[in-house]
Amino acid sequence: MSPATVLDSILEGVRADVAAREALVGMTEIKAAAAAAPPPLDVMAALRQPGIGVIAEVKRASPSAGSLAPITDPAKLARAYEDGGARIISVLTEGRRFQGSLDDLDAVRAAVSIPLLRKDFVVQPYQIHEARAHGADMLLLIVAALDQSALVSMLDRTESLGMTALVEVHTEQEADRALKAGAKVIGVNARDLTTLEVDRDCFARIAPGLPSNVIRIAESGVRGTNDLLAYAGAGADAVLVGEGLVKSGDPRAAVADLVTAGTHPSCPKPAR
């Protein structure tokens, strides 16, 4: 029987890939590597700086758009992002649909000094220790991919390793689940991962219902400064930008434009 949704299909592949990696490097080994890694950087401090932060993403492809950019040198791209003023760099490590890898995470970690987000479909505890072992400071947890007990467990394990969890939601119900699990940083993805359809009003609906102490990240649809300002007006603390940057001719300048807009005195400030 074929998977019921796009997300189900992605998760099926992820589970197979995790099992293959764990067969090569066991849980005991990956836990030891995570423990031996340099301490994680302070993601919350980066997100709480004044203005709307930019999380810039290393992203070669996506299920919705297909191939975006070859990105033969992820370290060079990450340095351009850092030079442009990005606060955090997101690295997609899922291979089948996004053409990413843990090698990309390693390369970026060696190239920059700002926090890194490992963006993947985390369904096994193994992946959390793996993220830390490869230098991640922040880890994506997708509510739609986890039942509530797994979400709570994964969030606790992520934080126990000193990382910050970015808990992704698409609906008000998922936001409630994220809050009940104890999420401190919630990302709203305008794209429904079960269908790949986009609801651009999603963030504006969900963000006002989040407590003031929760960091709010808008995860989709930022093509330029107008989109950033719109999300800022709806309560975003930061935006995550991938496609718009990797397809730009000058990623450093593209990030810098967003950073300038996000820190300009006229930029709306999140209500707190």
Swiss-Prot record:
Pathway annotation: Amino-acid biosynthesis; L-tryptophan biosynthesis; L-tryptophan from chorismate: step 4/5
Superkingdom of the source species: Bacteria
Keyword Lyase included in the entry's annotation: yes
Catalyzed reaction equations: 1-(2-carboxyphenylamino)-1-deoxy-D-ribulose 5-phosphate + H(+) = (1S,2R)-1-C-(indol-3-yl)glycerol 3-phosphate + CO2 + H2O
Residues passing through the membrane, by range: none
Pfam (any one): IGPS
Enzyme Commission numbers on file: 4.1.1.48
GO biological process: L-tryptophan biosynthetic process
Tagged with keyword Cytoplasm: no
UniProt KW keywords: Amino-acid biosynthesis, Aromatic amino acid biosynthesis, Decarboxylase, Lyase, Tryptophan biosynthesis
Molecular functions per Gene Ontology: indole-3-glycerol-phosphate synthase activity; phosphoribosylanthranilate isomerase activity
Protein name as catalogued: Indole-3-glycerol phosphate synthase
Organism: Mycobacterium marinum (strain ATCC BAA-535 / M)
